[in-house]
Amino acid sequence: MADRTSSSITIKAAKADIMAVIADLEAYPEWASGIREFTVQETGPDGRALRGRLTFDGGPFSDTVGLAYTWDGDDRVSWELVEKGTVVTGLHGTYALAEAGGGTEVTYELAVDVRVPMIGMVKRKGEKRIIDSALKGLKRRAER
């Protein structure tokens, strides 16, 4: 899973406020298109998810997967696939937040592997669509 796709957006909100939106995983269906359900299965001492199950509808593919999360304060969160779905066989993602002139720059990086053979360019285009949609939804949610 060496190839990763990433994109960034500047959000007019503090890092802590944006990370609070990101950390509220069970609310993702309200603002992240394609996410049907998220269930937190285990939390850490800070109340943030350590493990969860994500169900998504991604156009031609729908799946449910298990994810493990690693949090670095309000600076970064990463997640890894720990329970494969019927379609998704590998997944790694991160949100990295950095202060940027009156706002916060949020960079979302994603790599997804699927059982269905897919040309790299098509796979990256799909990842880019997921990332851009998530960043726009995050911006709307955090700036409201």
Task: State each model region's role.
Residues 111-144:
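A conserved amphipathic terminal alpha-helix motif
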Residues 1-47, 133:
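Hydrophobic ligand-binding cavity/cleft-lining segments
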Residues 4-5, 17, 54, 64-66:
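Structured catalytic core of nucleotide-sugar glycosyltransferases
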Residues 29-33, 37-44, 55-103, 111-113, ...:
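Hydrophobic-ligand binding "helix-grip"
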